[in-house]
Amino acid sequence: MIYLAGGCFWGVEEYFSQVDGVLDAVSGYANGRGDTTNYQLIHQTGHAETVEVAYDTNRISLKELLLHFFRIIDPTSLNKQGNDRGSQYRTGIYYTDKADLAIIDEVFKEKAKDYKKKIVVEKAPLKHFIKAEDYHQDYLKKNPNGYCHIDINQATYPVIDESKYPKPSATEIKEKLSADEYRVTQKNETEKAFSNRYWDSFDAGIYVDVVTGEPLFSSKDKFESGCGWPSFSRPISPDVVRYKEDKSFNMTRTEVRSRSGNSHLGHVFTDGPKDQGGLRYCINSLSITFIPKADMEAKGYGYLLSSVE
């Protein structure tokens, strides 16, 4: 069991109820003054809107749960998430098993690298948890159009642990990559259209960063765009790519880079299939390596098989 405060508990509860491996998610109030409060009193009693998450350790780890948690919060925002303000909307991780603290600390250390500001998420032993009123439980299931400050749909995207795919040193990268791969990933160059290795390949599998091996795209989201480069409607997870404004060649475009390796991948455009979200990730074949579905388990990517057709 772990207790997560991430702003309004309606969205946090609904998000975690959809995460594979979570057995139950219950809204409540935690770590305030005293063991009695309610929705009208929490701003006086100092409790945080918190979700009790019960999970199957054989299906999901605590670290994976915490990576999900950091996906849906702004960890640098004090007493504010989305449009909600007040100490009851602070972020926090409250544990009942001291052994969990080492994992929590590990995630904090990793996530601190992603932000310029200090992480202000509380981490503390659980003092008490008071179950919220019945009308708060499963609120968004009962009220599908109710207020929610997070994207619930992201719950179905896999969590990919960045620490498993560390970036090699500059020397190692130069030794590992071909001259063409190096020019594209490290010097932001673009390969030729219609003459690259994956533009017309649609076999089942995943595409990983040629530098780090971090998973980036799935064949399930690949489509024929006619542009001559591999095209995807989305990354395999929203966590694995970074975006940067690119004003080269007298154009304004959105560059796509890999998270762990910071490799230049390509650009994203808004002329993709409307029924798949409308985006087109135009990616250089030289920036990615294809892992066939049949090889994913043996190469350590078996946890992503459900993300592949």
UniProtKB/Swiss-Prot annotation:
Molecular function GO labels: L-methionine:thioredoxin-disulfide S-oxidoreductase activity; peptide-methionine (R)-S-oxide reductase activity; peptide-methionine (S)-S-oxide reductase activity
The entry's keywords: Multifunctional enzyme, Oxidoreductase
Peptide methionine sulfoxide reductase A: region residues: 1-153
SUPFAM superfamilies noted in UniProt: Mss4-like (SSF51316), Peptide methionine sulfoxide reductase (SSF55068)
GO cellular component, one term: cytoplasm
Domain (MsrB): residue spans on this chain: 170-293
Catalytic residue list: C8, C282 (nucleophile)
EC number(s) from the headed UniProt entry: 1.8.4.11, 1.8.4.12
BP GO annotations: protein modification process; protein repair; response to oxidative stress
Class of this enzyme: oxidoreductase
Record field: catalytic activity: L-methionyl-[protein] + [thioredoxin]-disulfide + H2O = L-methionyl-(S)-S-oxide-[protein] + [thioredoxin]-dithiol; [thioredoxin]-disulfide + L-methionine + H2O = L-methionine (S)-S-oxide + [thioredoxin]-dithiol; L-methionyl-[protein] + [thioredoxin]-disulfide + H2O = L-methionyl-(R)-S-oxide-[protein] + [thioredoxin]-dithiol
Tree of life domain: Bacteria
Function: Has an important function as a repair enzyme for proteins that have been inactivated by oxidation. Catalyzes the reversible oxidation-reduction of methionine sulfoxide in proteins to methionine.
Family: In the N-terminal section; belongs to the MsrA Met sulfoxide reductase family. In the C-terminal section; belongs to the MsrB Met sulfoxide reductase family.
PANTHER family: METHIONINE SULFOXIDE REDUCTASE, PEPTIDE METHIONINE SULFOXIDE REDUCTASE MSRA_MSRB
Protein name: Peptide methionine sulfoxide reductase MsrA/MsrB
Native source species: Streptococcus pyogenes serotype M18 (strain MGAS8232)
